[in-house]
Curated annotation (Swiss-Prot):
Stated name of the protein: Probable chemoreceptor glutamine deamidase CheD
Higher taxonomy: Bacteria, Bacillati, Bacillota, Clostridia, Thermoanaerobacterales
Alphabetized GO MF terms: protein-glutamine glutaminase activity
E.C. no: 3.5.1.44
Organism encoding this protein: Carboxydothermus hydrogenoformans (strain ATCC BAA-161 / DSM 6008 / Z-2901)
Pfam families, per database record: CheD (PF03975)
Protein's job: Probably deamidates glutamine residues to glutamate on methyl-accepting chemotaxis receptors (MCPs), playing an important role in chemotaxis.
BP terms from Gene Ontology: chemotaxis
Similarity-based family: Belongs to the CheD family.
Length: 159
């Protein structure tokens, strides 16, 4: 069975489910895996920081609110935060041209904020495939904790 995660969303699943998110450009996918329970989650983050916005926000959209939300949901299912294996994929520079690096560096900002939140929460970032300028698909196998990354141009790697 396969669960699909949309932009600014997350899904939880347990073995033998595969959780997939498509279209990771400047967005970052963060997977969480609890090996003892064979329980996992995949979060598709769109923006780094919710504090720049007002009103009712979807916490899954942002690194600073989405990562803590998913960890809480996993803990409700019996996961131990200290056992979670975290992997991160995406954060590409999808825009080019004059000023693109300084103005539109959403991918790099997403990567930086994810790393900060993961470290602040005391989580273990065990692997990542980030940056560059190509879109990615991310698939978490809840039977093993392996993450398959498909990069545009027929490149496939397992992290």
């Amino acid at each position: 069975m396969e669960l699909q995660v949309g932009i600014a969303d997350y899904k939880l699943g347990s073995s033998p489910v595969k959780i997939v998110t498509y279209g990771l450009g400047s967005c970052v996918g963060v997977s969480f895996y609890e090996p003892r329970l064979k329980l996992g989650a995949l979060l598709h983050i769109m923006l780094p920081d919710s504090t720049q916005f007002s009103g009712k926000l979807k916490p899954e959209k942002f690194a600073d609110t989405g990562i803590p939300l998913v960890v809480r949901e996993l803990e409700k299912q019996g996961a131990r935060k200290s056992s979670l294996e975290v992997k991160m994929v995406g954060g590409a520079q999808m825009f080019s041209g004059p000023g693109a690096q300084t103005v539109m560096n959403i991918g790099e900002r997403n990567i930086e904020m994810c790393r900060k939140v993961i470290a602040r929460m005391g989580l273990k970032l065990v692997a990542e495939d980030v940056g560059g300028n190509k879109g990615r698909t991310m698939i978490l196998d809840t039977a093993t904790g392996n993450v398959t990354v498909k990069i545009i141009g027929n490149i496939v790697k397992v992290i």
